[in-house]
């Protein structure tokens, strides 16, 4: 019962739905019971949500279910980029293709409010030529529709790590801090287009 690209089927004791905006929501059957039994802990709330309001909990993840009930994660809601054409793109999609090439150790797709996407790249090996890097980007782009292709890229001068504050301890990119650190280079990247 596996399907390539999916995280599997939803466990039998859980109910999942996809909201109108694509967010995965989990039905918490235990929440009304929890609220009843923790009234003292929640007494400072100005209003206690009804059980109907509490049952569906947003996860912050975007995803979809296929016809056979397999769940696919498409990215994090807070990471969605909206291009100047109004296209919503989960950056994790092109990032996963870039990382899958083996040429890149890290990739962060940028382009919120822009006509085209770009990427900040950390190569897996030092000294790769621009031609090799572009070939990796081109290869990833072949699997993407035009609106999600990487049209511009730049190399980061160091990996994104907890030591420099650009990643969490478990390796998640701190996107806002990375954008801030590379703001001048990103502006130049888009100024030349």
Report residues per predicted region.
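Gly/Ser/Thr-rich phosphate-binding loop
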Residues: 1-2, 105
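Conserved ATP-binding/catalytic segment of the ANL
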Residues: 10, 17-83, 100
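AMP-binding/adenylate-forming catalytic core of the ANL superfamily
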Residues: 18, 62-152, 159, 164
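Flexible lysine-rich "adenylation lid" loop at the C-terminal edge of ANL adenylation domains
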Residues: 156-182
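Acidic/polar alpha-helix N-cap and adjacent early helical turns
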Residues: 182-193
